[in-house]
Design a protein with these regions (language model features):
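C-terminal and inter-domain tail/linker signature
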Residues: 1-245
Length: 245
C-alpha cells in the first residue's frame, strides 16, 4: 500500500476556455486559470480515495461574478431553497478505504501549529514563522505577499467564524533530496457565521468549510503557502440559512 499526497510542487494549476453553456452559465469565450488541490490515497497506482478542493470562486470571478452572487444564482437555477443541491458538509461525507491521519514529521507538526494558532487569533505567529518575502496563494485566485497581506487574508477569514471549531483531519510532512521541506494539511472549520469578515455581515448561519493547505519552507521560514476552500459553497450555506432565492 502506498499513500500519495499532492504537495505544492504537484498542486494543479489549470487553464480553460469557457466555450459551452453549463454550470458556470452562458458561454463567454473567456480564458481562465485556477488552482486545484487533491488529497489522494492510492493502492497499486490506482486512486481509491480522494478529497478535492477547486477554487470555484476564482473561476466565477474571472467570468464576471462574485462568489456571493453566483451562489445565489446557483440556488435559483437548481430550483430554489427547498430543491437545490446542498453544499458539502460532514454529514454527507462517505467513508472511504483510507483511514490514516498522515505521518509523524516535524514539518507537518510545525505547519499544524501555525494554522491552529492563526485560527485561534494568534496572528503574531505569521511574523514568527513566515519568510518576510513569503507568498500566500489563496481562494478567489488571490496572492498575498509578506506579513501584512498574509495576515489580512487569514484574519478576514477567521473573524467571519470566530468561534468555529478547527479540526485537522490529515497532516503530513516530507523532506526529500533536491526539494525544500514541505507539509500538507487537510482541515475543516465548522461553526456559526457570527462575525464580520470575509463573508460580510454576520448571519449566524451554521457553516462547514473544508480546506487544504500546503506549505514550503526555506532558510528564512515558510516561503510559499497554498490554501484553498470553496467560497461558493460557503456563500451557498449562508444564503440557504437566510432563505434567499
Amino acid at each position: 500500500m502506498s499513500f500519495k499526497f499532492c504537495f505544492p510542487i504537484d498542486l494543479v494549476f489549470s487553464t480553460a476556455t469557457h466555450l459551452e453553456t453549463g454550470s458556470f452559465g452562458k458561454a463567454t469565450g473567456k480564458r481562465i486559470s485556477y488552482r486545484v488541490i487533491a488529497d489522494c490515497h492510492a493502492i497499486n497506482n490506482q486512486i481509491n480515495d480522494e478529497w478535492l478542493v477547486r477554487d470555484a470562486g476564482g473561476i466565477v470571478q474571472q467570468l464576471g461574478f462574485s462568489s456571493a452572487d453566483f451562489a445565489h444564482q446557483q440556488i435559483r437555477n437548481e430550483g430554489g431553497v427547498n430543491s437545490c443541491i446542498r453544499p458539502f458538509t460532514a454529514s454527507q461525507d462517505v467513508k472511504g478505504p483510507y483511514k490514516g491521519k498522515g505521518n509523524d514529521n516535524e514539518w507537518g507538526d510545525l505547519f499544524a501549529e501555525i494554522l491552529t494558532s492563526i485560527i485561534s487569533g494568534k496572528s503574531d505567529i505569521i511574523h514568527q514563522y513566515y519568510d518576510r518575502a513569503g507568498k500566500g496563494y489563496y481562494p478567489e485566485n488571490k496572492m498575498a505577499v509578506s506579513f501584512s497581506e498574509i495576515e489580512a487574508f487569514w484574519m478576514s477569514f477567521r473573524n467571519a467564524l470566530p468561534s468555529a471549531v478547527f479540526t485537522i483531519h490529515h497532516k503530513i510532512g516530507r523532506e526529500d533530496p533536491f526539494f525544500p521541506p514541505r507539509a500538507a494539511i487537510r482541515w475543516s472549520l465548522v461553526g456559526k457565521h457570527e462575525g464580520h469578515g470575509r463573508f460580510g455581515q454576520q448571519t449566524n448561519a451554521y457553516v462547514h468549510v473544508m480546506g487544504i493547505s500546503h506549505a514550503e519552507f526555506g532558510p528564512w521560514g515558510l516561503r510559499n503557502e497554498y490554501t484553498l476552500f470553496d467560497d461558493i459553497a460557503i456563500w451557498k450555506q449562508i444564503h440557504l440559512h437566510e432563505g434567499r432565492e
